[in-house]
Amino acid sequence: MANEETQPLLTCRNVFKYFGGLAAVNDFDLDVFPGDVIGIGGPNGAGKTTFLDVISGISPATSGDIALNGTPIAVKKPDAICHLGISRTFQLNAGFETMSIEENTLVGASFGLGDKGWFPRMTYNRQMRERVEKALVLCNLQDKADMVVRDLPVLDRKLLMLAGALATEPKLLLVDEPVGGLNPHEVDDVMEIVQGLIKEGVTIILIEHVMRFLLQLSKRVVIMHHGEKIYEGDSQGLLNDRKVVEVYLGEGTADRLQHMMEERAKNG
C-alpha cells in the first residue's frame, strides 16, 4: 500500500447502489493508490461487478462520493469517466465480429480520447497507431492484429477486450473476471500478461473467482458479501479470516490456497 504522503487515485466513500429495496453495494469505502493492484472476490451476487459498474458510470451510485484524483465522478457518464482515465473490461467477450483485432483496439483507443464525439476521431494517425501497437504488445496480440474477431478463441477475445481498454491509456484499469472459462494453462498466460501490466505501473482493480489468480497478483484483497466489504487486507490475512472462510472460501479451499502461498514463498 502507498505511504501516507501519497494521495489516492480513486476514493469511494459511503457508496450505495440500490435496485429497488436491495442494496447491491452497501456503504462501501475504498481508497486506490497509484500502482495498486486490488483484487475483489466474493460469492456470486456479492456486488462485485455492480461496484465496477458504479465506478465506471454504467450504473450510477444511488448515493455516496466517488472521486478520481479529487474530481467527483459519481454522476458522470461512462464516456466522460473514460476520458478522465478509467477504463474497464467486462465478463462477456464483446467485440465487433467482422472487424480485426487491430480495428477493434482502435475503437478502444478512440473512445479514450477526451474529445466531443469519438467516431469523428477514428483516424489511424501516429498517436493512435502508437496506442494500439503498445496495447497489442502488452496483451501479446501483436502477431494476430489482422485476425477477424469472429475467428478468435475465448482467450484471445478476452485479451482483445483488455487491449481495447489499455489503448485508452487509463490511469485506472477495471478488469472483470479476466480468466473465467479458461483452462489452467490459459489462466497462467493471462497472469503473465497482467504481471507485465503491473511492471508497467498500471493501477488495477480486478474481480476474479479463480483465487490463485487473485491472490498471486493482488497487493490488496477485498472480499464482498451481500454488497458489503467483509475483508480488506493482504492474502495471508484473508486465509486466516474466519468470516471469509465461512461465507466464501470454505475450509478445503483455504487450506489449498495456504499451501499454494507457502510453496510460492519457498520458491521465491
Model-derived features with residue positions:
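Conserved catalytic motifs of ABC-family nucleotide-binding domains
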Residues: 169
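The feature captures the beta-strand-to-loop junction immediately N-terminal to the Walker
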Residues: 41-43
